[in-house]
């Protein structure tokens, strides 16, 4: 039997899907990302959303101002697609190096997505230009039809929206974000070099039983929602396969405690502080620690056409216990795995 490593040295990772919010929340959560990640794709679903080059530049400056001294962190900005968005704004932002990608939220699919796209046909001109200039499209892949069960919305999206979109724009670089189903995993793994996906820590570690059995656990509630264990296992097998078009995207999405623990709680898991420990734990359980660095640090830059980070981090096989709460002024955040321990810590 091969001895398991006690220290893993990997290239500094990037987070290819994160919500940093703004103001006090931004200042509170950013250090948990900037300490260990070199770059992050920052979601644009603020209120109001980031739809112009000017608003993206201003938001990037607010993020950089909140980076703790000594952290080398670079936010990668995205543009929020709307039915009425001017295609020239997208092209200009990408060519200036302000926008790294554009984000497609189906209208009302998730938090702050009411301004989202009502039909792909409404943005076909934008997608055509994005394909031409090589700008990636990031997709929250769920249909919003009320007649479709919440557990089926990702698979239905692939069938009715994503596949036709990719047929129409075959050379458009597409990232199907935070995939949660065996259908999505199979679709991406069997796809071509223009299709990639991110996977979150919570969808690899947990399934819907963890959220619903023995009481409702609101801090595991996110969108897309946790699925049954067969889907969780399919995701785990996909990352263990070493597919080069799967990469780290935490979808870390903080909400104040009272907005999660309510009669109508918000969707989102704040996992930045536990993400790397969680990924290492899952990859070890799948006997795939040799695939961890590529998933965390190499596959994303390759797909985006960016260099890998030139610094390194180390994961140690030692117990780390995560905080029960994180102070947020007069409020607090309940982080992923609050009060729980894992056997991989990060330095």
Curated annotation (Swiss-Prot):
<keyword id="KW-0665">Pyrimidine biosynthesis</keyword>
<comment type="pathway">
    <text>Pyrimidine metabolism; UMP biosynthesis via de novo pathway; (S)-dihydroorotate from bicarbonate: step 3/3.</text>
</comment>
<comment type="subunit">
    <text>Homodimer.</text>
</comment>
<feature type="binding site" description="via carbamate group">
    <location>
        <position position="103"/>
    </location>
    <ligand>
        <name>Zn(2+) 2</name>
    </ligand>
</feature>
<keyword id="KW-0479">Metal-binding</keyword>
<feature type="binding site">
    <location>
        <position position="140"/>
    </location>
    <ligand>
        <name>substrate</name>
    </ligand>
</feature>
<feature type="binding site">
    <location>
        <position position="267"/>
    </location>
    <ligand>
        <name>substrate</name>
    </ligand>
</feature>
<dbReference type="GO" id="GO:0008270">
    <property type="term" value="F:zinc ion binding"/>
</dbReference>
<feature type="binding site" description="via carbamate group">
    <location>
        <position position="103"/>
    </location>
    <ligand>
        <name>Zn(2+) 1</name>
    </ligand>
</feature>
<keyword id="KW-0862">Zinc</keyword>
<dbReference type="InterPro" id="IPR004721">
    <property type="entry name" value="DHOdimr"/>
</dbReference>
<feature type="binding site">
    <location>
        <position position="223"/>
    </location>
    <ligand>
        <name>substrate</name>
    </ligand>
</feature>
<feature type="binding site">
    <location>
        <position position="178"/>
    </location>
    <ligand>
        <name>Zn(2+) 2</name>
    </ligand>
</feature>
<keyword id="KW-0378">Hydrolase</keyword>
<feature type="binding site">
    <location>
        <position position="17"/>
    </location>
    <ligand>
        <name>Zn(2+) 1</name>
    </ligand>
</feature>
<comment type="similarity">
    <text>Belongs to the metallo-dependent hydrolases superfamily. DHOase family. Class II DHOase subfamily.</text>
</comment>
<comment type="function">
    <text>Catalyzes the reversible cyclization of carbamoyl aspartate to dihydroorotate.</text>
</comment>
<dbReference type="GO" id="GO:0005829">
    <property type="term" value="C:cytosol"/>
</dbReference>
<feature type="binding site">
    <location>
        <position position="255"/>
    </location>
    <ligand>
        <name>substrate</name>
    </ligand>
</feature>
<dbReference type="InterPro" id="IPR002195">
    <property type="entry name" value="Dihydroorotase_CS"/>
</dbReference>
<dbReference type="GO" id="GO:0044205">
    <property type="term" value="P:'de novo' UMP biosynthetic process"/>
</dbReference>
<dbReference type="InterPro" id="IPR032466">
    <property type="entry name" value="Metal_Hydrolase"/>
</dbReference>
<feature type="binding site">
    <location>
        <begin position="19"/>
        <end position="21"/>
    </location>
    <ligand>
        <name>substrate</name>
    </ligand>
</feature>
<feature type="binding site">
    <location>
        <position position="251"/>
    </location>
    <ligand>
        <name>Zn(2+) 1</name>
    </ligand>
</feature>
<protein>
    <recommendedName>
        <fullName>Dihydroorotase</fullName>
        <ecNumber>3.5.2.3</ecNumber>
    </recommendedName>
</protein>
<dbReference type="GO" id="GO:0006207">
    <property type="term" value="P:'de novo' pyrimidine nucleobase biosynthetic process"/>
</dbReference>
<feature type="binding site">
    <location>
        <position position="19"/>
    </location>
    <ligand>
        <name>Zn(2+) 1</name>
    </ligand>
</feature>
<dbReference type="Pfam" id="PF01979">
    <property type="entry name" value="Amidohydro_1"/>
</dbReference>
<dbReference type="GO" id="GO:0004151">
    <property type="term" value="F:dihydroorotase activity"/>
</dbReference>
<dbReference type="InterPro" id="IPR006680">
    <property type="entry name" value="Amidohydro-rel"/>
</dbReference>
<feature type="modified residue" description="N6-carboxylysine">
    <location>
        <position position="103"/>
    </location>
</feature>
<feature type="binding site">
    <location>
        <position position="45"/>
    </location>
    <ligand>
        <name>substrate</name>
    </ligand>
</feature>
<feature type="binding site">
    <location>
        <position position="140"/>
    </location>
    <ligand>
        <name>Zn(2+) 2</name>
    </ligand>
</feature>
<feature type="active site">
    <location>
        <position position="251"/>
    </location>
</feature>
